[in-house]
Protein backbone atom coordinates (compact mmCIF):
# COMPACT_ATOMS: atom_id res chain seq x y z
CA UNK A 1 0.00 0.00 0.00
CA UNK A 2 1.28 3.46 -0.92
CA UNK A 3 2.45 5.71 1.89
CA UNK A 4 0.15 8.78 2.04
CA UNK A 5 1.62 11.84 0.32
CA UNK A 6 1.66 14.02 3.41
CA UNK A 7 4.43 16.56 3.94
CA UNK A 8 5.99 14.52 6.74
CA UNK A 9 6.18 11.49 4.45
CA UNK A 10 7.57 13.53 1.57
CA UNK A 11 10.34 14.61 3.94
CA UNK A 12 11.47 10.97 4.01
CA UNK A 13 11.80 10.71 0.23
CA UNK A 14 15.30 10.96 -1.27
CA UNK A 15 15.85 14.14 -3.25
CA UNK A 16 18.30 15.54 -5.78
CA UNK A 17 18.73 19.31 -5.94
CA UNK A 18 20.39 21.16 -8.83
CA UNK A 19 19.50 24.82 -8.25
CA UNK A 20 20.18 26.22 -4.79
CA UNK A 21 22.01 29.45 -3.96
CA UNK A 22 24.28 29.36 -0.93
CA UNK A 23 23.68 33.03 -0.12
CA UNK A 24 19.93 32.48 -0.38
CA UNK A 25 19.73 29.69 2.17
CA UNK A 26 21.25 30.96 5.41
CA UNK A 27 19.62 30.31 8.75
CA UNK A 28 18.25 33.60 10.15
CA UNK A 29 19.98 32.87 13.46
CA UNK A 30 23.28 32.53 11.63
CA UNK A 31 22.79 35.85 9.86
CA UNK A 32 22.22 37.55 13.22
CA UNK A 33 25.12 35.76 14.88
CA UNK A 34 27.70 36.55 12.22
CA UNK A 35 26.44 40.13 11.89
CA UNK A 36 27.14 40.59 15.59
CA UNK A 37 30.60 39.07 15.27
CA UNK A 38 31.68 41.21 12.32
CA UNK A 39 29.91 44.41 13.36
CA UNK A 40 27.38 44.51 10.53
CA UNK A 41 24.62 46.82 11.80
CA UNK A 42 22.34 47.21 8.77
CA UNK A 43 20.06 44.23 9.30
CA UNK A 44 16.36 45.17 9.13
CA UNK A 45 15.53 43.21 12.32
CA UNK A 46 17.29 42.19 15.51
CA UNK A 47 15.57 38.91 16.43
CA UNK A 48 15.33 35.64 14.54
CA UNK A 49 11.58 35.57 13.99
CA UNK A 50 11.36 39.16 12.76
CA UNK A 51 14.36 38.73 10.48
CA UNK A 52 12.95 35.54 8.97
CA UNK A 53 9.64 37.30 8.32
CA UNK A 54 11.41 40.28 6.74
CA UNK A 55 13.36 38.11 4.30
CA UNK A 56 10.23 36.29 3.25
CA UNK A 57 8.05 39.39 2.79
CA UNK A 58 10.77 41.48 1.15
CA UNK A 59 11.41 38.73 -1.38
CA UNK A 60 7.72 38.32 -2.22
CA UNK A 61 7.98 41.35 -4.45
CA UNK A 62 6.59 40.44 -7.85
CA UNK A 63 9.81 41.26 -9.69
CA UNK A 64 13.19 39.60 -10.04
CA UNK A 65 15.07 42.84 -9.40
CA UNK A 66 13.34 43.47 -6.04
CA UNK A 67 13.58 39.79 -5.15
CA UNK A 68 17.37 40.09 -5.33
CA UNK A 69 17.62 43.06 -2.93
CA UNK A 70 17.66 41.09 0.38
CA UNK A 71 20.83 39.30 -0.73
CA UNK A 72 22.83 42.38 0.23
CA UNK A 73 22.40 41.34 3.87
CA UNK A 74 23.32 37.67 3.49
CA UNK A 75 26.34 38.49 1.34
CA UNK A 76 27.47 41.08 3.90
CA UNK A 77 27.88 38.39 6.57
CA UNK A 78 29.74 36.03 4.22
CA UNK A 79 33.04 37.88 3.91
CA UNK A 80 35.40 35.85 6.12
CA UNK A 81 36.74 32.30 5.81
CA UNK A 82 35.04 31.33 9.06
CA UNK A 83 31.65 32.69 7.99
CA UNK A 84 31.85 31.07 4.56
CA UNK A 85 32.80 27.72 6.09
CA UNK A 86 29.97 27.93 8.62
CA UNK A 87 27.31 28.84 6.07
CA UNK A 88 28.44 26.03 3.76
CA UNK A 89 28.54 23.51 6.62
CA UNK A 90 25.06 24.45 7.82
CA UNK A 91 23.76 24.29 4.25
CA UNK A 92 24.81 20.64 4.07
CA UNK A 93 23.20 19.93 7.45
CA UNK A 94 19.92 21.54 6.42
CA UNK A 95 19.74 19.74 3.09
CA UNK A 96 20.58 16.37 4.63
CA UNK A 97 17.88 16.89 7.27
CA UNK A 98 15.41 17.27 4.39
CA UNK A 99 16.54 13.93 2.88
CA UNK A 100 18.45 15.53 0.03
CA UNK A 101 20.98 12.89 -1.05
CA UNK A 102 22.66 14.91 -3.80
CA UNK A 103 22.93 18.68 -4.24
CA UNK A 104 24.72 21.17 -6.42
CA UNK A 105 24.92 24.43 -4.50
CA UNK A 106 26.01 27.57 -6.31
CA UNK A 107 27.42 30.91 -5.25
CA UNK A 108 29.33 33.87 -6.75
CA UNK A 109 32.84 34.25 -5.29
CA UNK A 110 33.05 37.81 -6.63
CA UNK A 111 30.44 38.86 -4.03
CA UNK A 112 32.61 37.72 -1.12
CA UNK A 113 35.89 39.63 -1.57
CA UNK A 114 34.95 42.90 0.15
CA UNK A 115 37.26 42.18 3.10
CA UNK A 116 40.26 41.28 0.97
CA UNK A 117 39.86 37.56 0.38
CA UNK A 118 41.00 36.19 -2.96
CA UNK A 119 38.69 34.15 -5.17
CA UNK A 120 40.68 31.04 -4.30
CA UNK A 121 40.39 31.69 -0.56
CA UNK A 122 36.65 32.26 -0.84
CA UNK A 123 36.07 29.07 -2.80
CA UNK A 124 38.38 26.97 -0.64
CA UNK A 125 36.48 28.05 2.49
CA UNK A 126 33.12 27.06 1.01
CA UNK A 127 34.38 23.73 -0.29
CA UNK A 128 35.89 22.92 3.11
CA UNK A 129 32.53 23.67 4.71
CA UNK A 130 30.77 21.35 2.28
CA UNK A 131 33.29 18.56 2.87
CA UNK A 132 33.16 18.88 6.65
CA UNK A 133 29.37 18.96 6.54
CA UNK A 134 29.27 15.81 4.42
CA UNK A 135 31.50 13.97 6.89
CA UNK A 136 29.41 15.06 9.87
CA UNK A 137 26.15 13.99 8.22
CA UNK A 138 27.61 10.65 7.13
CA UNK A 139 28.74 10.00 10.70
CA UNK A 140 25.13 10.47 11.80
CA UNK A 141 23.86 8.04 9.15
CA UNK A 142 22.49 10.82 6.96
CA UNK A 143 24.72 10.59 3.90
CA UNK A 144 24.66 13.39 1.33
CA UNK A 145 26.87 14.41 -1.58
CA UNK A 146 27.24 18.16 -2.14
CA UNK A 147 29.09 19.68 -5.06
CA UNK A 148 29.62 23.31 -6.04
CA UNK A 149 28.70 25.41 -9.06
CA UNK A 150 30.77 28.58 -9.32
CA UNK A 151 28.67 31.53 -10.46
CA UNK A 152 29.59 34.75 -12.24
CA UNK A 153 27.32 37.78 -12.06
CA UNK A 154 25.96 38.65 -15.49
CA UNK A 155 26.08 42.43 -14.91
CA UNK A 156 29.82 42.30 -14.10
CA UNK A 157 32.88 41.58 -16.24
CA UNK A 158 34.51 38.77 -14.28
CA UNK A 159 32.97 35.72 -15.94
CA UNK A 160 36.15 34.52 -17.69
CA UNK A 161 38.10 34.84 -14.45
CA UNK A 162 35.39 32.94 -12.56
CA UNK A 163 35.32 30.24 -15.25
CA UNK A 164 39.07 29.81 -14.81
CA UNK A 165 38.50 29.52 -11.06
CA UNK A 166 35.97 26.75 -11.66
CA UNK A 167 38.51 24.80 -13.71
CA UNK A 168 41.25 25.24 -11.09
CA UNK A 169 38.98 23.65 -8.50
CA UNK A 170 37.32 21.05 -10.71
CA UNK A 171 38.91 18.16 -8.80
CA UNK A 172 38.22 19.70 -5.39
CA UNK A 173 34.43 19.79 -5.39
CA UNK A 174 33.50 22.16 -8.21
CA UNK A 175 31.47 20.47 -10.96
CA UNK A 176 30.39 23.40 -13.11
CA UNK A 177 29.88 27.08 -13.86
CA UNK A 178 26.87 29.41 -14.00
CA UNK A 179 25.91 33.01 -14.63
CA UNK A 180 23.19 34.68 -12.58
CA UNK A 181 21.61 38.04 -11.84
CA UNK A 182 19.01 40.22 -13.51
CA UNK A 183 18.46 39.09 -17.11
CA UNK A 184 17.12 42.31 -18.65
CA UNK A 185 19.96 44.18 -20.33
CA UNK A 186 22.50 41.48 -19.50
CA UNK A 187 22.23 38.77 -22.18
CA UNK A 188 24.25 35.58 -21.75
CA UNK A 189 26.10 36.23 -25.02
CA UNK A 190 28.10 38.93 -23.24
CA UNK A 191 29.91 36.07 -21.54
CA UNK A 192 30.76 33.90 -24.56
CA UNK A 193 34.44 33.93 -23.65
CA UNK A 194 33.69 32.22 -20.33
CA UNK A 195 31.46 29.59 -21.91
CA UNK A 196 34.00 28.87 -24.65
CA UNK A 197 36.66 28.46 -21.97
CA UNK A 198 34.50 25.94 -20.13
CA UNK A 199 33.82 23.97 -23.31
CA UNK A 200 37.50 24.00 -24.27
CA UNK A 201 38.22 22.39 -20.90
CA UNK A 202 35.46 19.78 -21.31
CA UNK A 203 33.55 21.28 -18.40
CA UNK A 204 29.82 21.69 -17.80
CA UNK A 205 27.78 24.83 -17.23
CA UNK A 206 24.25 26.02 -16.64
CA UNK A 207 22.83 29.46 -17.37
CA UNK A 208 20.09 31.40 -15.61
CA UNK A 209 17.75 32.05 -18.53
CA UNK A 210 14.03 32.37 -19.14
CA UNK A 211 13.20 33.33 -15.58
CA UNK A 212 12.07 36.88 -16.21
CA UNK A 213 13.21 37.87 -19.70
CA UNK A 214 11.58 35.26 -21.90
CA UNK A 215 12.47 33.32 -25.02
CA UNK A 216 15.38 35.47 -26.31
CA UNK A 217 17.37 34.67 -23.17
CA UNK A 218 16.71 30.94 -23.54
CA UNK A 219 17.57 31.05 -27.26
CA UNK A 220 20.92 32.72 -26.60
CA UNK A 221 21.74 30.32 -23.76
CA UNK A 222 21.16 27.29 -25.97
CA UNK A 223 22.03 28.39 -29.51
CA UNK A 224 25.03 30.63 -28.87
CA UNK A 225 26.34 29.71 -25.41
CA UNK A 226 25.75 25.94 -25.47
CA UNK A 227 24.24 25.60 -21.99
CA UNK A 228 24.07 22.07 -20.60
CA UNK A 229 21.11 23.05 -18.38
CA UNK A 230 18.83 26.04 -17.93
CA UNK A 231 18.46 27.78 -14.59
CA UNK A 232 14.68 28.23 -14.39
CA UNK A 233 13.80 28.28 -18.11
CA UNK A 234 10.15 28.64 -17.16
CA UNK A 235 9.40 31.06 -20.02
CA UNK A 236 9.90 28.25 -22.55
CA UNK A 237 6.14 27.89 -22.13
CA UNK A 238 5.84 30.97 -24.37
CA UNK A 239 6.93 28.74 -27.26
CA UNK A 240 4.21 26.14 -26.61
CA UNK A 241 0.66 26.42 -27.92
CA UNK A 242 -2.11 24.45 -26.23
CA UNK A 243 -5.14 23.79 -28.42
CA UNK A 244 -8.73 23.62 -27.07
CA UNK A 245 -8.67 19.83 -27.23
CA UNK A 246 -5.70 19.62 -24.88
CA UNK A 247 -3.06 18.89 -27.50
CA UNK A 248 0.13 20.91 -27.74
CA UNK A 249 2.27 22.31 -30.52
CA UNK A 250 5.91 23.09 -29.79
CA UNK A 251 7.72 25.97 -31.42
CA UNK A 252 11.27 25.43 -32.70
CA UNK A 253 12.95 26.53 -29.47
CA UNK A 254 10.75 24.37 -27.26
CA UNK A 255 11.23 21.46 -29.65
CA UNK A 256 15.01 21.52 -29.54
CA UNK A 257 14.98 21.99 -25.78
CA UNK A 258 12.86 18.86 -25.38
CA UNK A 259 14.56 16.86 -28.14
CA UNK A 260 18.04 17.47 -26.72
CA UNK A 261 16.78 16.68 -23.20
CA UNK A 262 18.16 19.94 -21.85
CA UNK A 263 17.21 19.96 -18.16
CA UNK A 264 15.04 22.70 -16.72
CA UNK A 265 15.96 23.71 -13.16
CA UNK A 266 12.44 24.77 -12.19
CA UNK A 267 11.86 26.64 -8.92
CA UNK A 268 8.09 27.01 -8.42
CA UNK A 269 7.95 29.05 -5.19
CA UNK A 270 10.66 31.42 -6.35
CA UNK A 271 8.87 31.95 -9.67
CA UNK A 272 5.74 32.89 -7.73
CA UNK A 273 7.65 35.45 -5.66
CA UNK A 274 9.33 37.10 -8.66
CA UNK A 275 6.09 37.36 -10.60
CA UNK A 276 7.02 34.81 -13.26
CA UNK A 277 3.76 33.00 -12.40
CA UNK A 278 0.60 34.11 -10.61
CA UNK A 279 0.15 30.96 -8.51
CA UNK A 280 1.58 27.47 -8.14
CA UNK A 281 -1.48 26.01 -9.87
CA UNK A 282 -0.74 28.26 -12.86
CA UNK A 283 2.93 27.28 -12.98
CA UNK A 284 3.80 25.56 -16.28
CA UNK A 285 5.62 22.80 -14.41
CA UNK A 286 2.72 20.41 -14.99
CA UNK A 287 2.43 21.22 -18.70
CA UNK A 288 6.17 20.76 -19.16
CA UNK A 289 6.17 17.51 -17.19
CA UNK A 290 3.20 16.19 -19.19
CA UNK A 291 4.96 17.11 -22.44
CA UNK A 292 8.01 15.13 -21.24
CA UNK A 293 10.48 17.95 -20.90
CA UNK A 294 13.36 17.15 -18.52
CA UNK A 295 11.82 18.91 -15.52
CA UNK A 296 13.45 19.04 -12.10
CA UNK A 297 12.27 20.43 -8.75
CA UNK A 298 14.46 23.00 -6.99
CA UNK A 299 14.49 25.46 -4.11
CA UNK A 300 16.43 28.43 -5.56
CA UNK A 301 16.71 30.34 -2.26
CA UNK A 302 15.52 28.51 0.82
CA UNK A 303 15.62 31.52 3.15
CA UNK A 304 14.04 34.06 0.81
CA UNK A 305 11.36 31.66 -0.39
CA UNK A 306 10.83 30.10 3.06
CA UNK A 307 11.06 26.70 1.42
CA UNK A 308 12.74 23.31 1.22
CA UNK A 309 12.77 20.49 -1.30
CA UNK A 310 10.02 18.77 0.67
CA UNK A 311 7.87 21.89 0.64
CA UNK A 312 8.41 22.40 -3.10
CA UNK A 313 7.34 18.81 -3.79
CA UNK A 314 4.37 19.07 -1.45
CA UNK A 315 3.16 22.25 -3.15
CA UNK A 316 3.36 20.50 -6.53
CA UNK A 317 1.48 17.49 -5.16
CA UNK A 318 -1.27 19.76 -3.85
CA UNK A 319 -1.44 21.76 -7.08
CA UNK A 320 -1.32 18.94 -9.62
CA UNK A 321 -2.18 15.73 -7.79
CA UNK A 322 1.17 14.05 -8.30
CA UNK A 323 1.90 10.62 -6.84
CA UNK A 324 5.07 8.95 -5.59
CA UNK A 325 5.87 7.78 -9.11
CA UNK A 326 5.87 11.37 -10.34
CA UNK A 327 8.13 12.56 -7.52
CA UNK A 328 10.49 9.68 -8.24
CA UNK A 329 10.61 10.62 -11.93
CA UNK A 330 11.39 14.25 -11.13
CA UNK A 331 14.12 13.14 -8.71
CA UNK A 332 15.69 10.78 -11.24
CA UNK A 333 15.47 13.54 -13.86
CA UNK A 334 17.58 15.71 -11.58
CA UNK A 335 20.07 12.98 -10.83
CA UNK A 336 20.47 12.16 -14.52
CA UNK A 337 21.16 15.85 -15.12
CA UNK A 338 23.80 16.30 -12.41
CA UNK A 339 27.29 17.36 -13.41
CA UNK A 340 29.09 14.48 -11.69
CA UNK A 341 30.36 11.47 -13.70
CA UNK A 342 27.84 9.02 -15.15
CA UNK A 343 28.80 6.10 -12.93
CA UNK A 344 28.32 8.21 -9.80
CA UNK A 345 24.93 9.41 -10.99
CA UNK A 346 23.85 5.86 -11.77
CA UNK A 347 25.01 4.60 -8.38
CA UNK A 348 22.93 7.20 -6.52
CA UNK A 349 19.87 6.41 -8.66
CA UNK A 350 20.14 2.63 -8.34
CA UNK A 351 21.48 2.34 -4.79
CA UNK A 352 19.74 5.23 -3.03
CA UNK A 353 16.86 6.86 -4.89
CA UNK A 354 15.04 3.85 -6.33
CA UNK A 355 15.27 1.66 -3.19
CA UNK A 356 14.05 4.43 -0.90
CA UNK A 357 11.14 5.31 -3.16
CA UNK A 358 10.26 1.61 -3.36
CA UNK A 359 9.73 1.62 0.40
CA UNK A 360 7.39 4.62 0.14
CA UNK A 361 5.43 3.17 -2.77
CA UNK A 362 5.05 -0.11 -0.89
UniProtKB/Swiss-Prot annotation:
SS bond list: none
Catalytic activity: adenosine + H2O + H(+) = inosine + NH4(+); 2'-deoxyadenosine + H2O + H(+) = 2'-deoxyinosine + NH4(+)
Top-level taxon in the UniProt lineage: Bacteria
Family per record: Belongs to the metallo-dependent hydrolases superfamily. Adenosine and AMP deaminases family. Adenosine deaminase subfamily.
Keywords, ordered alphabetically: Hydrolase, Metal-binding, Nucleotide metabolism, Zinc
Naturally occurring in which organism (per UniProt): Mycobacterium leprae (strain TN)
Record-listed Zn(2+) binding positions: 19, 21, 208, 300
The name this protein goes by in its record: Adenosine deaminase
Residues the record lists as binding substrate: 21, 23, 181
Site (Important for catalytic activity): 232
Cofactor(s) named in the record: Zn(2+)
GO MF assignments: 2'-deoxyadenosine deaminase activity; adenosine deaminase activity; zinc ion binding
GO CC terms in record: cytosol
Function description: Catalyzes the hydrolytic deamination of adenosine and 2-deoxyadenosine.
Active-site residues from the entry: 211
Cofactor remark: Binds 1 zinc ion per subunit.
GO biological process, one term: adenosine catabolic process
Entry's EC annotation: 3.5.4.4
